[in-house]
Amino acid sequence: MSDERVVTPRAGEEDQQIEKSLRPRRLAEFIGQEKVVEQLRIAIAAAKGRGEPLDHTLLYGPPGLGKTSLAGVLANEMEVNIKLTSGPAIERAGDLAALLTNLQKDDILFIDEIHRLNRAIEEVLYPAMEDFALDIMVGKGPGARSLRLKLPRFTVVGATTRLALLTSPLRDRFGSVHRLEFYSVDALYEIVMRSARILGVVCTPEGAREIAARARGTPRIVNRLLRRVRDYAQVIGDGIITLDVARDALAKLEVDHLGLDENDRRLLRAIIDLFGGGPVGLSTLAASLAEEVDAIEDVYEPFLLQLGFLQRTPRGRIATRRAYEHLGVPYVERSVDNGAEQGRLWT
């Protein structure tokens, strides 16, 4: 269900096709993430000055914030090729070996969802990242021997939404680690105006800011909302996205002024109505919503935590006073006994 939401940060097929035309190609075009961009600018200049590949780089943060786009920008700035893959796509050590042996000098290997690499594949990746060498086994049984192949110097750029799931040995092999934060409304406004120009959409500043304010701090969502509002303006209006058109379109999409949709409100109401405001365990909450645990952790929670609507505790999730106020539900202070009782739901 979460992937069908207009405010999901996960990329659908339409997003993947459209995003290619909207992605920035250079750091100068990249909007937001100023600290990360400046750190990468220095790293790129230093690497090019020494004639070396970029340090292995890890990008982490909620989905939809531009990790893949930033990897492409790094390749363009370094003037090298980039090969794209993902943790789940590398099923066997042979898959990784094929990728590594096809890399040219200074190329970038981008691994999305790198936390989903299995341990056997990580063992192959370690010497490749450290020594630019690939250890392969030749033969079987007692006569098997290890053969080391030299690889050209290259850069691994890893992306993950779940930094804590990376093993320490893998995490330690990245010389450059950067967290991508949610975007400000001002930054998202700039993204809307830029995307509107590329898509040939007429959008007033007021309309653009309204879309930006409801995009949950996420560029992928702001671009998706822009396309949905564009459709509404084309069919219902004169094709121009004004403030009123944006508000009407977003109201029909059930995206409120903070960027919450009906699924977010349903999650908060479940905690409040079914579990007395919490604490409630993650697996129990997921079961009550017929959702996957990963979807709640990766898709729902980051923005609700950012808004201060949700609190994580050792005993489970708690809806905050702000969540009650947003839903128009009277807030009742939880007693210690109630918290202890609800704590039994923690898993």
UniProtKB/Swiss-Prot annotation:
Please tell me where DNA binds in this chain: 312, 317
- Where it mainly occurs, coarsely classed, is cytoplasm
Q: Where is this region: Large ATPase domain (RuvB-L)?
A: 1-183
Arranged from A to Z, the UniProt key words for this protein are: ATP-binding, Cytoplasm, DNA damage, DNA recombination, DNA repair, DNA-binding, Hydrolase, Nucleotide-binding
UniProt-annotated stretches for the region Small ATPAse domain (RuvB-S): 184-254
Q: Which subcellular locations apply to this protein?
A: Cytoplasm
Q: Which GO terms describe its molecular function?
A: ATP binding; ATP hydrolysis activity; four-way junction DNA binding; four-way junction helicase activity
Q: Where is Mg(2+) bound in this sequence?
A: 68
Q: Does the keyword Lipoprotein apply?
A: no
Alphabetical GO CC annotations of the entry are: cytoplasm; Holliday junction resolvase complex
CDD domains in alphabetical order? AAA
- Write down the superkingdom of origin: Bacteria
- What GO terms describe the biological role, i.e. biological process, of this protein? DNA recombination; DNA repair
Q: Which Gene3D superfamilies match?
A: 1.10.8.60, P-loop containing nucleotide triphosphate hydrolases, Winged helix-like DNA-binding domain superfamily/Winged helix DNA-binding domain
Q: What is its EC number?
A: 3.6.4.-
Query: Which residues are noted in the entry as ATP-binding?
Result: 22-23, 64, 67-69, 130-132, 173, 183, 220
Alphabetized PANTHER family for the sequence: HOLLIDAY JUNCTION BRANCH MIGRATION COMPLEX SUBUNIT RUVB (PTHR42848:SF1), PTHR42848
How are the domains described in the entry? Has 3 domains, the large (RuvB-L) and small ATPase (RuvB-S) domains and the C-terminal head (RuvB-H) domain. The head domain binds DNA, while the ATPase domains jointly bind ATP, ADP or are empty depending on the state of the subunit in the translocation cycle. During a single DNA translocation step the structure of each domain remains the same, but their relative positions change.
Q: Describe the subunit structure.
A: Homohexamer. Forms an RuvA(8)-RuvB(12)-Holliday junction (HJ) complex. HJ DNA is sandwiched between 2 RuvA tetramers; dsDNA enters through RuvA and exits via RuvB. An RuvB hexamer assembles on each DNA strand where it exits the tetramer. Each RuvB hexamer is contacted by two RuvA subunits (via domain III) on 2 adjacent RuvB subunits; this complex drives branch migration. In the full resolvosome a probable DNA-RuvA(4)-RuvB(12)-RuvC(2) complex forms which resolves the HJ.
What does this protein do, in the record's words? The RuvA-RuvB-RuvC complex processes Holliday junction (HJ) DNA during genetic recombination and DNA repair, while the RuvA-RuvB complex plays an important role in the rescue of blocked DNA replication forks via replication fork reversal (RFR). RuvA specifically binds to HJ cruciform DNA, conferring on it an open structure. The RuvB hexamer acts as an ATP-dependent pump, pulling dsDNA into and through the RuvAB complex. RuvB forms 2 homohexamers on either side of HJ DNA bound by 1 or 2 RuvA tetramers; 4 subunits per hexamer contact DNA at a time.
The name this protein goes by in its record: Holliday junction branch migration complex subunit RuvB
Taxonomic lineage of this organism?
Bacteria, Bacillati, Chloroflexota, Chloroflexia, Chloroflexales
